[in-house]
Amino acid sequence: MDFNSLRKKIITKKASVKELVNDIFLKIDSDDPEINSYICTTKDNAIQQAENIDKLIQNEEILPPLAGMPIAIKDNICTKGVHTTCASKMLKGFIAPYESTASDKLWSSGGICLGKTNLDEFAMGSSTETSVFGVTSNPWDISRVPGGSSGGSAASVAAGLCSAAIGSDTGGSIRQPASFCGVVGLKPTYGRVSRWGLVAFASSLDQIGPITNTVSDAAEILYSISGKDPLDSTCLDQPVPNYLINLNKSIKDLKIGIIKECFEHPGLNTEVKDSVLCGVERFKNLGAEIIEVECPRFNDGIATYYVIAPSEASANLARYDGVKYGFRSEEGSNLIDMTSKSRAEGFGDEVQRRILIGTYALSAGYSDAYYKKAQKVRTLIRNDFDKAFKKVDILLTPTCPTTAFLKGDFSNDPLSMYLSDLLTVPANLAGLPAISIPCGFDTKGLPIGLQLIGNVLEEDKILNAAHIFEIDAQVIKNRL
């Protein structure tokens, strides 16, 4: 249920916040064993938070902006006193000693924490199949994946097991599962939201953002979690506009760029292409000006990303050695042996694969050939975006080349799964804001996502365009 629907129930006193929260936990108990979107729930704490909001309502006090909204948190974001595992054996049982800035802002705004959601181990994946806690199912078809790495967050929203969820996006990990699950997923500008308390995968790419039922809900959450944070030196010290107030503006004469290279890629599914092009026509009918633009290096993004991201991951994950915290092997005969075995046993196959790729790319004799060249291509991709934004206000692409695939489809060919990020990674490489919104369905009844990309700190433009599209299209009127 979206925020506005919940607020109506609360304000008209058709239900107390405590009753609504209890109802959600009953639904989690009945539905989540099949979906497996949650790693753990925080019912006692959520009930206490709900009772506090009910007291404010009873006393007719001013309510914080997200008062009573039930929200789930991806389990690579620290929540004080609650398990933060990154869905890995390496951190299984680890309890965070502090609260992330983003989640702390949510609770200060009145949001209620329901629990921690499943993900690909250490956020490395596109299917939520690599979690030590088991595979998450897509609520639209439980034989299929929800996408990744924020698959648990997207699945929980789509299945009505929370009103909204927080995820992280390194190469598409919010937008791709949002597309697969038929919900809204927003990756803000790099630095718009503090990364303090986000377990690092690739520090120059990671960004926290919302997964919601509606664009307006995403706008509300973004406003609540954005802003300068002295604990994160990469967090931007820029004013945060009220994104919700800026919705509903006319998009007449808005210049939308259609990236030519995206629609010509041989890996793009025909049904996805046709659905997104129908979305383009809808924007045109709403008054937007459609302009074809070229980003010659857009399709080089995937190769660039899979050099830079593993390189940063190999450095970030070096801290997990079994000494101060995390999994420790009992079989090591000395410190070096213990560290080696702890990492071999604690990390799954995909995490080990990416660590090895990154270590190789950074190694002496290969850094110039791979990592430094990838950084040069990254700059060229950013330059392509700069040129495009001189002609248009926002850019439009499909979110993913395909709809949700079957579980196990890429078990024997994990590298092919990397192509799921084909259309999402360029925005991360350039640090740009991007949003995925539902635009239709394929013949199997699976959701298709449309992606809008904005210039730096221009979330308001993509949110407004997405909101106008959402109202006009009414793609998903009733949630599962």
Curated annotation (Swiss-Prot):
GO terms for molecular function: ATP binding; glutaminyl-tRNA synthase (glutamine-hydrolyzing) activity. Transmembrane segments: none annotated. Its EC number is 6.3.5.7. SUPFAM superfamilies: Amidase signature (AS) enzymes. The active site is at K74, S149, S173. PROSITE patterns: AMIDASES. Belongs to the amidase family. GatA subfamily. This is Glutamyl-tRNA(Gln) amidotransferase subunit A. The lineage of its organism: Bacteria, Bacillati, Cyanobacteriota, Cyanophyceae, Synechococcales. The gene is gatA.
